[in-house]
């Protein structure tokens, strides 16, 4: 958390305070991150936290982090973290103490960890983001288990076939088996590796 009231006053005096604000949906088109949304792929913004130097834009496809050097610099680095490639985990929400001005949400996308301070007056909105990220992480975990189970079942079936006597053209049977395995693995990944989590936010 960014600190207590006196620490915040000092930080504000030095221009260092960077408490994020949750942006209203009607203003999503005004944030920098909106320029990098893949509209052609059906990407849609569901949640935005904006601070003096950074934007955290949560979409149905993942997180767009518009990373700024400082509040006074116009230099920005846009980083994309897709649900399809990175699992959400370690989600925590820290509420404010008596003299705190901010609340804090922490989470990770794969190996990338984030910690965002937010105005404590927006706790209820931040709870919604917390719950959405936790649910997405749970779904990803279940899907990962389903993919692993599907692959193991396919492996056991192939081993059973390899131990049996093949009738007919062996090379043709092996070729057909490889094609089946490839298609089956694709189907398993497509079924259990979600790209779109918009329904969780809605």
Q: In which residue ranges do the predicted regions lie?
A:
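N-terminal recruitment modules of adaptor/scaffold proteins
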Residues: 2-75, 163, 170, 174, ...
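Acidic, Ser/Thr- and proline-rich intrinsically disordered linker/docking segments
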Residues: 2-8, 22-23, 28, 73-202
């Amino acid at each position: 958390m960014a600190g207590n009231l006196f620490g915040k006053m000092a930080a504000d005096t030095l221009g260092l305070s960077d408490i994020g604000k949750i942006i209203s949906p009607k203003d999503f088109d005004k944030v920098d991150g909106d320029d990098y949304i893949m509209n052609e792929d059906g990407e849609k913004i569901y949640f935005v936290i904006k601070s003096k130097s950074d934007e955290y834009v949560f979409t149905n496809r993942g997180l767009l982090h518009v990373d700024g050097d400082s509040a006074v610099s116009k230099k920005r680095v846009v980083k994309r973290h897709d649900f399809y490639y990175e699992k959400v985990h370690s989600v925590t929400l820290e509420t404010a103490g008596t003299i705190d001005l901010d609340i804090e949400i922490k989470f990770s996308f794969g190996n990338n960890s984030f910690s965002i301070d937010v105005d404590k007056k927006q706790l209820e909105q931040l709870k919604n983001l917390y719950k959405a990220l936790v649910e997405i992480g749970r779904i990803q975990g279940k899907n990962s288990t389903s993919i692993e189970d599907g692959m193991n079942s396919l492996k056991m079936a192939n081993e059973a076939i390899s131990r049996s006597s093949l009738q007919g053209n062996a090379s043709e049977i092996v070729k057909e088996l490889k094609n089946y395995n490839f298609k089956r693995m694709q189907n398993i990944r497509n079924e259990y590796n979600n790209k779109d989590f918009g329904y969780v936010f809605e």
